[in-house]
A protein has these predicted regions:
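Surface-exposed interaction regions that form or flank ligand-binding interfaces
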Residues: 1-67, 76-79, 85, 90-93, ...
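Phosphate-centric recognition/catalysis
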Residues: 70
């Protein structure tokens, strides 16, 4: 698999210095560095499983915007936009609703990861159409978890959900 890493504030060897970690946290938010670590775990697994026919673009910034697409995977099955999460706990995904489940009660989460992954997929699809790239299957948005402490109960979610125990199966 060919990896194109466009992560901002990284050194030539791919590491992030302490100063750049602080800059990234201030510029992109507190979850920036944990998100990068989760992405790296996912990329390591995908790199072992996928062949040379795949290209992975990491943290691509779309032209004329500040939208950062975490992972774009291009290969024979098509184009997939992968949003990697490091959250833990028990969640429910029903259509476009995303929230925590505790004591049998559902509570909407402050950040809806399903909608975020879905919107990233739509943004990439629109971006590619403007660049005159057409794909028969379109762009598939995926929410991928690398944390085994995350449980998701799903009922027809708007994006494909891949839990940590199924990442290798997803890649094969």
């Amino acid at each position: 698999m060919r990896i194109i890493d466009k992560t901002p504030l990284t050194n030539e060897d791919g590491s992030i210095s302490f100063i750049n970690r602080i800059k990234g946290t201030l510029q992109y938010g507190f979850s920036w560095y944990p998100d990068l670590q989760a992405q790296q775990k996912a990329i390591d697994i995908l790199d072992r499983q996928l062949g040379k026919k795949f290209i992975l673009v990491r943290n691509h910034i779309l032209e004329n915007s500040k939208i950062i697409v975490p992972i774009i995977l291009i290969g024979p099955p098509g184009i997939q936009v992968i949003y990697v999460t490091h959250v833990q706990g028990s969640y429910r995904a029903k259509n476009d609703a995303w929230g925590t489940v505790s004591g049998g009660n559902f509570k909407d989460a402050s950040i809806n990861l399903l909608k975020r992954a879905h919107q990233l997929g739509k943004v990439v699809e629109i971006y590619l159409k403007k660049k005159s790239f057409e794909f028969p299957k379109g762009v598939e948005p995926i929410l991928l978890s690398v944390n085994p402490a995350l449980h998701i109960s799903s009922v027809r979610p708007i994006v494909r959900i891949v839990l940590s125990d199924a990442v290798e199966r997803f890649a094969s």
